[in-house]
Structures are given as C-alpha cells and as structure tokens.
Amino acid sequence: MLEGAKSIGAGAATIASAGAAVGIGNVFSSLIHSVARNPSLAKQLFGYAILGFALTEAIALFALMMAFLILFVF
C-alpha cells in the first residue's frame, strides 16, 4: 500500500515537468517574436531568454528532486 502511494506521489510531482516544458516553449517563442519585431535588440533579448530558461528549468529540477525524495526517503 505504501509503495503504491509513493509511486502516485512521485508521478504527481513529475507533472511539473510538463509545465516546465510549456514554460520553456513560451520563453523561446517570445524570444523569436521579439527578435522578429526588433532585430537590433537580439543580443540583449537572448540574455533574458537564457535567464528565463534557467529559472523555468529550475522548477523542473526541483520537481524531479521532490519525486526522488518521495520515492527513496519517505
């Protein structure tokens, strides 16, 4: 019973990975639209996009960490 609950909890924690994938897609789609509107700001916008990517990917890594904690610690 406890093993099943752990698996369900870990699966629920990894749902955040789908949200992170959508967020990363939004970051880079916004970058493409912004560079298409104003190509002279491409270098500055790329820096912002990489920052947005890193922050969004951190959410997925935290979710993965929580899934491992649920599976192997609790």
UniProtKB/Swiss-Prot annotation:
The record marks 57 as: Reversibly protonated during proton transport. GO terms for cellular component: mitochondrial membrane; proton-transporting ATP synthase complex; proton-transporting two-sector ATPase complex, proton-transporting domain. Coiled coil: none annotated. It is a multi-pass membrane protein. Gene3D superfamilies: F1F0 ATP synthase subunit C (1.20.20.10). The chain crosses the membrane at residues 8-28, 45-72. One of its GO terms (biological process) is proton motive force-driven ATP synthesis. CDD domains: ATP-synt_Fo_c_ATP5G3. InterPro entries: ATP_synth_F0_csu, ATP_synth_F0_csu_DDCD_BS, ATP_synth_F0_csu_sf, ATPase_proteolipid_c-like_dom, F/V-ATP_Csub_sf. Keywords: ATP-binding, CF(0), Hydrogen ion transport, Ion transport, Lipid-binding, Membrane, Mitochondrion, Nucleotide-binding, Transmembrane, Transmembrane helix, Transport. SUPFAM superfamilies: F1F0 ATP synthase subunit C. It is found in: Mitochondrion membrane. Its main location: mitochondrion. It comes from the Eukaryota. Pfam families: ATP-synt_C (PF00137). One of its GO terms (molecular function) is ATP binding. Belongs to the ATPase C chain family. F-type ATPases have 2 components, CF(1) - the catalytic core - and CF(0) - the membrane proton channel. CF(1) has five subunits: alpha(3), beta(3), gamma(1), delta(1), epsilon(1). CF(0) has three main subunits: a, b and c. This protein is one of the chains of the nonenzymatic membrane component (F0) of mitochondrial ATPase. This is ATP synthase subunit 9, mitochondrial. The lineage of its organism: Eukaryota, Viridiplantae, Streptophyta, Embryophyta, Tracheophyta. The gene is ATP9.
